[in-house]
Each structure stands twice: as structure tokens, then as C-alpha cells.
Amino acid sequence: MASSPLTANVQGTNASLRNRDEETADKQIQFNDQSFGGNDYAPKVRKPYTITKERERWTDEEHKKFVEALKLYGRAWRRIEEHVGSKTAVQIRSHAQKFFSKVAREATGGDGSSVEPIVIPPPRPKRKPAHPYPRKFGNEADQTSRSVSPSERDTQSPTSVLSTVGSEALCSLDSSSPNRSLSPVSSASPPAALTTTANAPEELETLKLELFPSERLLNRESSIKEPTKQSLKLFGKTVLVSDSGMSSSLTTSTYCKSPIQPLPRKLSSSKTLPIIRNSQEELLSCWIQVPLKQEDVENRCLDSGKAVQNEGSSTGSNTGSVDDTGHTEKTTEPETMLCQWEFKPSERSAFSELRRTNSESNSRGFGPYKKRKMVTEEEEHEIHLHL
């Protein structure tokens, strides 16, 4: 009998635990159905908020003062602020914006009885910037020359937006022409009456700052310079040409590196092409030693053959000794001449093509080039035979 109430308590506790488990299971199922079920999503609730700042209120007295100040001062918000006294300039400006929009709206479509007729003041002109960006000028030719400050001369650094080429050109102008100034303010000393002994066109010429004034300086210097002699190098020959008089003619100071000799009757394979001197002309005419075609050489030599034969007997002392076979001795040449022009004898003509041979061609060179040279010589020899 004593064990019966204990068992009853145990059974009651077990039943209560089962009921709790069932309730929690049912709640979990319902939560899953709400969260993961079909397309039925719970709407998000916005967080509640409260407006703490209240909108400023304008009384009738303040509005009347505002309208009076608006008629007196226009859009001068600081003066309107002083006139109203109870509102700041920012509040007055926002109130004026709303008031102007209301006046414009009622003037166009609504009744004008609610709002007093008032003339809206025009907007104030925009302020010019205190430190504007440097602007590009339209015409560079209209600009006057820039004045050089004494501090800039000491430091040699331009203070304005100009290229270093322009500043260097200004310095060169100042150094080249001490008696002339670019502008009346260009020198640090007080302006003095300076006169130059230049020509009339130079006095009328106005110096303006250009992008590249170095070309102008070069033109001025070249016009002032005296005529000078120029040396031209043509095919290994140096020729002196003077600017005065005939620019194309050669002066008596022209010289050639090859010796000057009259043309003998016969030329060997080792004889160089000489230079002919004509007694009627005062100047020397140098033949440019360039390879010519065979036909041109033949035509020239046939025309001058008779004159050469007549001169050959009288000029024997100047040339080398002639052998019985008709060959002349080899004349001495300068050591600076590494290359020489040679005549290759042929059967049909007195002269053939000019060959240029190098003194070091026997010791230097690559094998295939030598073979090619031999092949070309054989082909040309066959051509001479056919001619």
C-alpha cells in the first residue's frame, strides 16, 4: 500500500513531460512551415522612428519683417537677417525660396488674394573667382613681350607659364644686344634714352616673344656674317667654294688628292686616270673618277684622240719614260690613296670599263665573294670577246 502514491507521482511527471515534448514539436513544425513554406513570406517590419527636430515656424511678424527687408535689400541675406533679428541667414534663404515658388505658382494659375503681390528681386551676379586658372589667349601675335624681373634674372627661373626655350632665348637676346632692351620694363635699372647705330629696317623691326625665337636669331646672324669659304667633299675630293661671285665655279685654291698629269698615248693596266689641264682656261677642271660604261668611254676617247696624240710628243718630260712596247712606268701616288682606277685592255676598243680594285683585296675577303668575282670577270671577258 505504501508504494502506490510514489508510482502515481512518477506516472504524473512522465505524462507532463510527454505533453511538453509534443507542444515543442508542434511549435517547431509550425515555425518551419512559416519560414520555409511555399511563396508565403512574412513582411519585414520597419523599425519605428520619431521626428525629434521640429520644423521652424515663422510668425506673422517675422514674415512681415522678412517682406519689408526683401523690398529694401533684395537678396542680401545678411542684411535681412539683421532686419528680422530672430532667424539666421540660412533659414531666411530657405524661407525666401519657398515664398518665391509660392508667389510664382499663384501668379500663374491660382488666386492672388492669399499672397500679397510682390516683385521677386533678380538673382545677384556671380562672383568672379579670386584665384582663377591660367587661361589660354586667342592670338599669340597680339601679345606683347614679357618683362623680365630682376629676381628672375638672378635665379634664371621663369615665374610665369612659359617654356624654358623662351626664357633661354630672352637671356641670349639680352647678352647679344646690350644696347637694346625687349621692353621698357625689361631691365632692373630705370629706363634711359638709348640709341643704336643700326640700319633703318633693324630699327623698325619689333621683337616679339615667339615659341621658337632661335630661328630668328640664326637668320639675323647669318645675314650679318661676311661671305665665308665652304669646303665640299665630292667622291674623296675636297673642293673649296667661295660664296662671293660665282658659287658654282671653283677657285684657284681647289686641290685634288690625285696627281695632275697630261694624258699619254697609251695606258697600261696599272695606270691611273689623269687630269687634263687646258691652257686656255685659268681654272682647273677635275674629272670625277666614277665608273663609266664602255660605250661612253669609247666615244669620249675617240673624240679626244687626235688632240692627245699631238700633245703626247711635247709633254714627254712630264710623264714617265716610255718603253719600246708602249708601256709607261708606274708613277708614284700618295699613300693616302688606298683605291685606284684601272683600265682593262680589250681587243676591239682602246678603253674599256673602269675597274675599282682595292689594294687589300688580295689579303682580305671571304671565299664565296672571291669566287663570284672570278665568275663575273670571266663573263665580262666573254662579253668583250663578243664585242
UniProtKB/Swiss-Prot annotation:
CC annotations in GO: nucleus
Biased composition (Low complexity): 172-200, 312-323
Gene3D superfamilies for the chain: Homeodomain-like (1.10.10.60)
CDD domains per UniProt: SANT
Role summary: Morning-phased transcription factor integrating the circadian clock and auxin pathways. Binds to the evening element (EE) of promoters. Does not act within the central clock, but regulates free auxin levels in a time-of-day specific manner. Positively regulates the expression of YUC8 during the day, but has no effect during the night. Negative regulator of freezing tolerance.
Major subcellular site: nucleus
HTH myb-type domain segment(s): 50-104
DNA-binding residues: 77-100
GO biological process: auxin-activated signaling pathway; circadian rhythm; regulation of auxin biosynthetic process; regulation of DNA-templated transcription
PROSITE patterns to which the protein is assigned, alphabetical: HTH_MYB
Key words, A-Z: Biological rhythms, DNA-binding, Nucleus, Transcription, Transcription regulation
Pfam families cross-referenced by the UniProt entry: Myb_DNA-binding
Disulphides: none
Record note on disruption phenotype: No effect on the regulation of core clock associated genes, but shorter hypocotyl length and higher freezing tolerance. Rve1 and rve2 double mutant has no alteration in the period or phase of the clock. Rve1, rve2 and rve7 triple mutant has no alteration in the period or phase of the clock.
NCBIfam families registered for this protein in UniProt: myb_SHAQKYF (TIGR01557)
Compositionally biased residues, Polar residues: 1-17, 27-37, 141-166
Compositionally biased spans, kind Basic residues: 124-134
UniProt induction comment: Circadian-regulation. Peak of transcript abundance near subjective dawn. Down-regulated and strongly decreased amplitude of circadian oscillation upon cold treatment.
Keyword Disulfide bond (UniProt): no
Localisation per UniProt entry: Nucleus
Region entry Disordered, spans: 1-44, 105-200, 306-334, 350-387
The organism of origin for this protein: Arabidopsis thaliana (Mouse-ear cress)
Biased composition (Basic and acidic residues): 324-333
This protein's name: Protein REVEILLE 1
MF annotations from Gene Ontology: DNA binding; DNA-binding transcription factor activity
